[in-house]
């Protein structure tokens, strides 16, 4: 969880932490760096994300980092980006 000098706080759900720990360290660092440097510093994290379509995923956003996807819920009232899942683009939506 990060919030110092950032517009939005990044919070990981337990499932997302499990996803992250399964990845190699360089990939973990790349994804964490993206969240810290690109997403958390924005006044509106929707500016670089993409809304997910569909009944189950309609309220969520995705961020693309190479072949990896970060699925998030943006909670404006709490100024939080909640990371729900992290995974390869072929598997993360299952």
Question: How would you name each of these model-derived features?
Answer:
Residues 70:
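NAD-dependent ADP-ribosyltransferases
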Residues 1-61, 67, 75-79, 91-94:
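Basic, Lys/Arg-enriched alpha-helical interface segments
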């Amino acid at each position: 969880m990060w919030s110092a000098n950032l517009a939005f706080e990044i919070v990981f759900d337990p499932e997302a932490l499990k996803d992250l720990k399964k990845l190699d360290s360089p990939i973990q660092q790349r994804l964490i760096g993206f969240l810290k440097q690109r997403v958390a510093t924005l006044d509106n994290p929707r500016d670089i994300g993409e809304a997910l379509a569909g009944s189950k995923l309609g309220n969520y956003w995705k961020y693309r980092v190479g072949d990896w996807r970060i699925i998030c819920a943006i909670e404006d009232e709490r100024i939080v980006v909640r990371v729900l899942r992290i995974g390869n683009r072929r598997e993360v939506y299952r």
